[in-house]
Design a protein with these regions (language model features):
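Double-stranded beta-helix
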Residues: 50, 205-224
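Short, charged/polar surface micro-motifs in flexible loops or helix N-caps
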Residues: 175-178, 202-205, 218
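Short, conserved beta-strand element in jelly-roll/cupin
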Residues: 189-205
């Protein structure tokens, strides 16, 4: 009602309203969410051609079209930084679910990840995670979380001044399993948002999510 009456920009600029109705979006249909999203995009999408940096322009336009874009070369994470991150998380305790809140809330050491054989749909099913504090205590990740180049892409795509609000680090072992988080699904946290995924190791069908649905950010139904 509020967005229909006053517009998305009014809602987005009002922190009180956003806090009050943060979870309300989960009760809305995809069709209604996409309608609000597309109306917002159409107010500034023509300005994409005015983006002064060619690489930023390419990335934003590709994300608008496909819903995702490989920005490996744009962000330029160094090999030694990748190794540092991997070694860091091997030394930290983790939870036995793809998200700490989707676990039994008990921390364990990295060395124990192959010891759990529960038949629970989510817990001990090959997926593990670290809390946000653990992730942000790593210098490489903290610098990426507040990275100006990533923020610029987010601002240009969303059409307003964005702020990072969540960080999730997930680990999964090589195991032929079916897990709810790797089945095709859509997480809609806001009407307009941008997410950045970093794969610190190689992935395949038994080790990490590897497929994105082209157009699933703007269409309710997409082809397989």
């Amino acid at each position: 009602f509020i967005i229909n009456k006053f517009g998305y920009k009014f809602f987005n600029n009002n922190k009180v309203l956003r806090l009050l109705f943060f979870t309300s979006i989960r009760g809305m249909s995809l069709n209604k969410i996409f309608k609000i999203r597309n109306i917002h995009f159409n107010t500034f999408i023509k300005k994409d051609d005015e983006i002064y940096d060619d690489e930023k322009k390419r990335i934003v336009k590709e994300v608008r079209k496909k819903g995702y874009c490989d920005i490996t070369n744009y962000i330029g994470i160094k090999k030694e930084e990748i190794n540092e991150v991997k070694n860091y998380f091997k030394s930290q305790q983790l939870y036995n679910g793809h998200d700490p809140l989707q676990s039994d809330l008990k921390k364990s050491d990295y060395s124990e990840i192959y010891n759990n054989n529960s038949n629970h749909e989510i817990f001990n099913n090959g997926y593990f995670s670290y809390d946000a504090e653990t992730s942000l205590n790593n210098t490489v990740l903290k610098n990426l979380f507040y990275n100006k180049k990533l923020k610029q892409i987010s601002d240009l795509y969303c059409g307003f001044n964005t702020e990072p609000y969540n960080i999730c680090t997930m680990l999964n072992i090589k195991k032929e399993i079916k897990h709810p988080v790797t089945e095709y699904h859509r997480d809609i946290d806001d009407f307009v948002s941008a997410g950045f995924f970093i794969f610190w190791t190689k992935t395949d069908k038994n080790n990490g999510a590897t497929t994105y649905k082209v157009g699933s950010h703007i269409k309710e139904n997409v082809e397989n």
